[in-house]
Regions:
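Beta-rich strand-turn-strand
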Residues: 93-101, 147-161, 167-171
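A short, glycine- and basic residue-enriched loop/turn
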Residues: 137, 154-155, 176
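Domain-scale signature associated with acetyltransferase and cell-envelope carbohydrate enzymes
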Residues: 1-117, 140-141, 175, 184-225
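Glycine-rich NAD(P)-binding loop of Rossmann-like domains
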Residues: 77, 129-139
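Conserved catalytic-core motifs of eukaryotic protein kinase domains, centered on the activation segment
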Residues: 120-121, 127-129, 189-190
Length: 225
């Protein structure tokens, strides 16, 4: 689409429909979901398995050809879990797969087609055992993960880190570090006292995400009738 010709009132009605769908059909699949979630095309978001938790003001942008999925391996004796902080953003095509535990901190920014998994899902030799090797993945606050990146089992990523597009992350990333490549390697260190501006600051109050989205669409659709 080259230009969205809808008037703002038409977008507002569509947004109400998306919000209602989120509340009635998507939210019940979460173990817990904070208020003010904003999900674009929520029918393209899949939550499979128990123990998927998300904080306040989560923002998900999905498409038919780029669905977003949160998947938990759930054997009865030791189900996995996913914990997502406040004010996180998930673009289309993202896959989060937990056999044990994945934690994503506040204000995380995940670009399209990112994959995060805490398991290999099969052994190198034993490819049929139902208990795959796994290790928790911990992602800090204000982490930015570029498009198409892969984060594997046992990885810890520190606060404010940046993961370059299409990077393959198999080892820990220190806080305030930019990594890129396959495998990912440090290419820059950020000033921990630098002028960071985070989604948590912008959207931290209860109505922040609603105000941000309404302002953005009013500006985009102004003049349409």
């Amino acid at each position: 689409m080259r230009h969205d010709h809808r008037p703002y009132w038409m977008h507002a009605l569509w947004e109400q429909f998306e919000n209602a769908w989120t509340r009635h059909f998507l939210e019940p699949h979460f173990e817990s979901l904070g208020g003010h979630a904003k999900v674009v095309r929520p029918w393209n978001v899949e939550v499979f398995g128990p123990n998927v938790h998300a904080g306040q003001a989560i923002h998900i942008v999905s498409r038919k050809d780029q669905p977003v999925s949160f998947t938990v391996w759930s054997p009865s004796d030791a189900p996995g879990e996913i914990h997502i902080g406040d004010c996180c953003f998930f673009a289309g095509g993202i896959r989060i797969l937990a056999a044990e535990k994945i934690v994503i901190g506040n204000a995380a920014l995940l670009a399209k087609s990112v994959t995060i998994t805490d398991s290999d899902w099969h052994g190198l030799y034993d490819r049929i055992t139902a208990r795959p090797p796994s290790a928790p993945v911990i992602i800090g606050d204000n982490v930015w993960i570029g498009a198409g990146a892969f984060v594997g089992k046992g990885v810890t990523i520190g606060d404010n880190a940046v993961i370059g597009a299409r990077s393959i992350v198999t080892k820990d990333v220190p806080a305030n570090t930019v990594v890129a490549g396959a495998p990912a390697r440090p290419i820059r260190t950020l000033d921990p006292d630098g002028p960071f501006k985070t989604r948590l600051e912008m959207l931290g109050d209860a109505e922040g995400l609603d105000r941000f989205m309404k302002a953005a669409y009013r500006d985009q659709l102004k003049g349409n009738s």
